[in-house]
Structures are given as C-alpha cells and as structure tokens.
C-alpha cells in the first residue's frame, strides 16, 4: 500500500529503535572498555571475542530471518516478535555487564562469550522483525524515508543520552565503583526497553498486501541470489558499519589516553550522534525527494571520507577544529546510515519484481548479516590495534599506542567510507526504476486478485 504514514505511527515505530539501542548502544559505547578496564579481560581476548561473536550474530540474523518469514499470526508476521522476544533480550543486556570479577581470566572469557552470544541471538530475533516491519507498513518512498530518518534520530538520541547519563558516572571512577554503575543502569534500561517495545507494537500495523504463500527455503535463496542491488547495498553497508563501530569502540580510549580527559567523552558522543545523525536525519527525506536515495548516500559517504581525513590531521593541534571535522564526518555518516534503511526496503520489491516472491525477513536478515559483520570488524579493529601497539590498561600510553588510537578513530573510518562511496556509485536501483517496479507489482496483484475472485465466484 502506498498511503502516507501518520507521525504518530512513525514516532511509535522509532521507539522500537530506542529500545533496541538500550541493549545495542550500551555494547557499542562501553562494552570493550568494561571488559578490559573493569572485568579484567585482556584486550586481545576481548577483541577476538567481539569479532567471533559478531560473526555468530550475523549467522543468527539469517536464522532469525527464516524464522520470521515462516511466521504468520493474527498480529501479523513481524509485530509478535516485539511482544514476546523482548524479555530475553533485555535480560541478556544486563548479564553481559555482570562478569564475576573474582573469577579466573579463563572463566571470565567463557562467561563473556556465552552471555554475549545469548545477547546476539535474542537481539536478532527482535531486531530482524523490527527492521522488516518497515517494508510491511508502506511502499510509499517518502514514508519509508521518514521511517528511516525517525529510527536514525531515535538511535542517535539514545547514544547521546546514554553517554550523558553513564559517561559522567564512570569519570575518574575506580573499577569497583564502575561495576555498580553498570549494574544499576543496565537494569533500569532493561525495564524501560520492554515498555518501549510494547508501545512500538501497539503503534504499528502491517499494511502491505501479500498474495503469494510462504516460499520454500530453496525458492527464497534463489530469490536472494538474483537480487544484485541487495548484494551491492550489503557491501556498502558493511563498509559504513566498519567505519561507524571503529569510531564508537575507539572513543573512550581516545578521550582517556589521547586527550587525557574522560569528561570529553560525552562531548565526543554528542558531536558524533546529536550534531551528526540527528542533524542530518531530518534532511534525508528532502534530499531523497530532490536527488534520489542513491545520490543522497553518495553525498553522505563523500562527506564522511573528507571529514575523517581532516579529523586525523587537525586533531594533533586544535581540538575545536578537530570537533568540527568530526561533526562533518558524522553528518555524512548519518546521511548514509539513515538512507540505508530506505534502500534496503526497496530491494524487497526488486526481488518480488524479479521472481514474484516477497521475502522481507530473509532480505532484511542478509542486510543485517553484513551489518553485523561490519560491527564485528569495526568493533574489533581498535582492540587488535591496541594489542599490537602495546596497550596496557589504566597506564600512561606510549606514542605507538597513541598513534594506534588515532588511526582507529580516524583513518580506519575514512578508508571504509571511501570504499562505500565507490561501491554505491555503481548501485543500479534508481528511484525512477523503483517507481516502475512498484507499479508493475501492484498491477500483478490486481490481476491475481481478479483471477481469485473469478474462480471463487
């Protein structure tokens, strides 16, 4: 259906991403630092775990996508997961920050693996249907862009709020004091997350008409194999997520050891998210209407590339100029992250256009699979660079470690944003082509419905 969605529906949908990020953003902002500086897990072990478990999460996404595509209830295909999958997710979001500090190092690592894997699986079983829900709510391009913008703003505001709430609490705190801080906030956020998921469930409806029966796994996979725009978008998303999570995982180390002021952590997160994504997300629907989704992505990727390169060079002599450069990079990255959701939704119709099979869950899960791989690679790169450069927790760092941190937070994201630009430059699904596809699909559905009506009558 091509109707415009109300702002109440769009806001209600975005609250689901606030809840998502109560679990997700906590990990992105604080988990590596928690493992190394509080729980006593070695940097190399933590980096390896973050990489391997994120790869596990990626495969969990594919499993979740298949589960979602096989479900059909009176609440729809996607909304039931928001109702019944949230409690396990929120429980694991608490457990990952509850590593017993008096255990041996090996036992801590095993506990971290098990709880982080549990968090990843539960997150997949909620986030895959949540993301797929947007494709079932509307086929109207501007509404899809608004849904993407709303969830982008919601996610970024959540990042900023968590940084402001928790960042000052761990400033100059001992590891023992930080344990209590993390325990308190994870419990509070778990309860709030379950409430927000329920509001999201009540605020949304699945409106897109489905004619065909549930396809077999083989047919679903054949549909995916023919979807070239989806694969190109996945590679572009992989690069953007590597860039994003390299910055997130490096930020606390950057302010602590390069700037020597953990109080600047909230400023850094504010620039990255509020100034970046929240400033850029409202612009995306207008940009999409004027120049299309592909060109909007390209502009964002180019801004990100230039901003991160500038950030690397100026950060050694002027913090204010460095923050301006980071804001430019973050705006570009915010544009790409926001428009990415609308591009993914379009690939569902492209697959349906080619094969007659509509597989929202598996399509989104493949997209999320590559995003998780990007998160794994991006989140682990700083840990590996720290380990290779000789990082020792809670000590004055060597020049090699300082350069490693600066590389992780600037040059790594710069390179991957440039690669994303190159890949999407060749992306074939333009807005004009998408409109033609939607018209063709609607015409096919009308013919099918007429045939069904003629047979039954």
UniProtKB/Swiss-Prot annotation:
Q: Name one GO molecular function term.
A: symporter activity
Stated membrane topology is: Multi-pass membrane protein
Positions in the Cytoplasmic compartment: 1-11, 61-79, 130-146, 202-228, 285-296, 344-372, 430-457
- Which segments sit on the Periplasmic face? 35-37, 101-108, 168-180, 250-263, 317-320, 394-408
Q: Name one GO cellular component term.
A: plasma membrane
Question: What are the protein's UniProt keywords?
Answer: Cell inner membrane, Cell membrane, Membrane, Sugar transport, Symport, Transmembrane, Transmembrane helix, Transport
Where it sits in the cell: the answer is: Cell inner membrane
Q: Please, what other remarks does the record include? A: In some K12 strains, the protein is inactive for transport, probably due to a mutation at position 100.
**Protein's recorded name:** Glucuronide carrier protein
